């Protein structure tokens, strides 16, 4: 995980300088955008167009091969009709550049990219109808199936076996769970970790493999109006958590994040599953693991947000967006139990398919 010392902290003047030097563009408008570990800026050059300058934290900037593959994946998806960002080449034809900056902790190297800006509203800001939830599930499954078609000599770098946000890394949460000391929810978190090890890990060989986006959340999905009361997905953002994984991981992550802002979170799973299965039907082992994998993602979000706030207390408001509400959802799902939650999800999915 990145730390406070690795997060970039570029000034307005540094942004305008790097945009001019690397891309030959004069930034007439620059404004910061929210980010968990990195630094993002909206940039509107006087020459025209709209972009996002993405400055990776210095820890992740060491993984050049991973970020290069993420960038190529975005281009691949865009070429196949999915609403992903693309990277603008530098004046020397590179899709990324390693730059030195002193952000208060000595000179460090940060990886910089200029990505196309996708207009739209994050799904977190709208009330999601069952139809848009269905579309989200369908889009998540489509993304994973399209990425299976991508050929690249370095796909092995996406194994990322100890990447803390991978769902296979749930046992690694034991290193961080101490940040929950004194919180009664810690007992639930420990219980979920144990259930993952006992009930999910033995089924991993039965899951279908793919490349996961890994962060299909309500702040990384953009929508735009499609008629008087409808929306359609207009953008998929932030591929920084891409890794080799399993189809069922993407679905679990998607359901968890779509629950966060929902006034009726238990009603989210059904439409998302229905949309997902319209592209990629689940097998028995995947269906049987979905509840625990959703719970695992809630635990990751809660524990890692608490840990990161200790590193970045000034960023607490943004870091805790998901985990504050996720705390209630995690407790409620635990209280209801696997059988009842799965019954609601799969029954609702079946009913949605019959509409």
UniProtKB/Swiss-Prot annotation:
Presence of the UniProt keyword Flavoprotein in the record: no
Active-site residue list: 215
One GO cellular component term: cytoplasm
Chemical reaction(s) catalysed: (5R)-5-hydroxy-L-lysine + GTP = (5R)-5-phosphooxy-L-lysine + GDP + H(+)
Enzyme category, top tier: transferase
Location in the cell: Cytoplasm
General function of this protein: Catalyzes the GTP-dependent phosphorylation of 5-hydroxy-L-lysine.
Family statement: Belongs to the aminoglycoside phosphotransferase family.
PANTHER family assigned: AMINOGLYCOSIDE PHOSPHOTRANSFERASE DOMAIN-CONTAINING PROTEIN-RELATED (PTHR21064), HYDROXYLYSINE KINASE (PTHR21064:SF1)
Protein name: Hydroxylysine kinase
């Amino acid at each position: 995980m990145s730390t406070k010392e690795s997060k970039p902290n570029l000034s307005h003047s540094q942004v305008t300088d790097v945009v001019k030097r690397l891309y030959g563009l004069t930034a007439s408008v620059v404004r910061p955008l929210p980010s968990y570990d990195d630094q993002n800026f909206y940039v509107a050059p006087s020459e025209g167009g709209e972009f996002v300058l993405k400055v990776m934290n210095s820890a992740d900037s060491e993984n050049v091969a991973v970020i290069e593959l993420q960038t190529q994946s975005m281009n691949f998806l865009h070429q196949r009709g999915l609403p992903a960002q693309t990277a603008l080449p530098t004046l020397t034809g590179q899709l990324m550049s390693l730059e030195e900056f002193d952000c208060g902790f000595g000179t460090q190297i940060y990886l910089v990219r200029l990505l196309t800006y996708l207009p739209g509203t994050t799904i977190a800001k709208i009330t999601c109808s069952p139809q848009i939830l269905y579309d989200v599930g369908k889009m998540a499954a489509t993304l994973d199936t399209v990425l299976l078609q991508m050929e690249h000599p370095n796909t092995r770098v996406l194994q990322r076996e100890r990447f803390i946000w991978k769902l296979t890394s749930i046992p690694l949460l034991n290193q961080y769970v101490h940040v929950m000391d004194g919180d009664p929810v810690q007992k639930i978190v420990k219980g979920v970790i144990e259930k993952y090890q006992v009930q999910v890990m033995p089924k991993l060989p039965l899951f279908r493999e793919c490349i996961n986006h890994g962060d299909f959340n309500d702040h990384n999905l953009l929508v735009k109006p499609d008629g008087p009361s409808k929306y359609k997905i207009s953008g998929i953002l932030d591929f920084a958590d891409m890794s080799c994984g399993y189809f069922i991981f993407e679905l679990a992550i998607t359901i968890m994040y779509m629950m966060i802002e929902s006034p009726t979170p238990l009603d989210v799973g059904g439409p998302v599953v229905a949309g997902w299965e319209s592209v990629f039907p689940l097998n028995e082992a995947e269906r049987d693991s979905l509840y625990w994998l959703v719970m695992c993602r809630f635990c990751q979000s809660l524990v890692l947000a608490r840990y990161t706030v200790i590193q970045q207390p000034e960023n607490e408001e943004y870091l805790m967006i998901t985990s504050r509400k996720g705390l209630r959802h995690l407790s409620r799902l635990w209280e209801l139990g696997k059988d009842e939650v799965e019954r609601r999800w799969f029954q609702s999915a079946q009913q949605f398919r019959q509409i």
